[in-house]
């Protein structure tokens, strides 16, 4: 998703200061709340996750945030980590909404797409063009305020989006490191 045109890469650099944000992830629909976390550098021109040795660093408890942050010197210079979760990438809910719902009043799908964009770019794995195209279009339509019902005019489109999302999950998983202690 390195070419995902959610923002204009030709725009002049921003004067905004980068800061750290904690993102929580839920993949099991039977689990309440996040199952694991990562840190993201946000507010600049290169939003990115915590990376060490070419792998995205996730951690299973927020108490591991300092240990995780120490693994990525480029993010560590941004300061102390946030104390709480600032955004959620609810993969389970996103898949449910994409598969069967007509509305996403809380913007769960768009939030997930935006975080996946940063994570997939960090993997260095090239996303297949058909998946990149469909997720880019979905993000654009959701940003414009279109409902899922208006976007998904047929079931096969839902299936294609699900395939693209699951490709992202696989790419991120293959380039992940999970801190458990």
Region locations from a protein language model:
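Short N-terminal edge-element motif at the start of the domain
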Residues: 2-78
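Glutamate identity and glutamate-enriched acidic tracts
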Residues: 3, 18-19, 32, 47, ...
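Generic structural signal of hydrophobic/aromatic residues within well-ordered alpha-helices
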Residues: 65, 69, 88-94, 134-139, ...
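Short amphipathic alpha-helical linker/capping segments at the junctions of internal repeats
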Residues: 72-94
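Basic Lys/Arg-rich amphipathic helical interaction modules
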Residues: 92-106, 110-111, 145
């Amino acid at each position: 998703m390195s070419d995902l045109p959610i923002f204009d890469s030709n725009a002049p650099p921003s004067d905004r200061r980068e800061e750290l944000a904690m993102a929580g992830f839920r993949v099991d629909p039977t689990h309440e709340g996040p199952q694991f976390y990562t840190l993201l550098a946000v507010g600049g021109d290169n939003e990115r996750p915590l990376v060490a040795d070419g792998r995205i660093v996730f951690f299973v408890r927020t108490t591991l945030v300092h240990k995780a942050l120490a693994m990525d010197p480029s993010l560590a210079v941004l300061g102390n980590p946030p104390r709480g979760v600032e955004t959620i990438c609810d993969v389970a809910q996103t898949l449910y909404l994409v598969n069967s719902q007509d509305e996403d009043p809380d913007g769960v799908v768009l939030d997930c797409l935006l975080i996946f964009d940063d994570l997939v770019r960090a993997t260095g794995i090239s996303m297949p063009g058909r998946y990149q195209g469909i997720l880019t279009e979905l993000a654009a339509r959701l940003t414009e305020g279109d409902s899922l019902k208006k976007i998904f005019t047929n079931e096969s489109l839902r299936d294609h989006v699900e395939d693209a999302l699951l490709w992202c999950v696989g790419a991120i998983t293959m380039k992940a490191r999970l801190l458990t202690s």
